[in-house]
């Protein structure tokens, strides 16, 4: 079996150096009109960047993504725009509900708590929308119902190639 040549290797944090939309666009431009083989090895990162890279793969057309190692979160979303997705026999793939960093320190009075609760309810509603969007993307790719994928995301377990 011939060894695959990877035109793009995306490793590390999605949204970090060499794993952002600008870098991917530049690398895809060098392969205009050609099949592009992409290796992904990432525990995830920025959902916004993952969605953007997915769109870049879809716009390019003939993109094949291959996962190695442990892959999660935004890295899995980035792959969804590829024409073909494969996973190494020993690799793992994690889908989970979206999350957001939350830091609140100090003492709060009743009014401040009310404001904080309202802010948290808004964040929860936004996260629910992001979860629905991701579930729809995964579901379209694997030809399942979004509700099934949302349940899988809620569990947040690692999936193997099997």
Question: Which residues are covered by each model-predicted region?
Answer:
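Terminal-region recognition feature
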Residues: 1-162
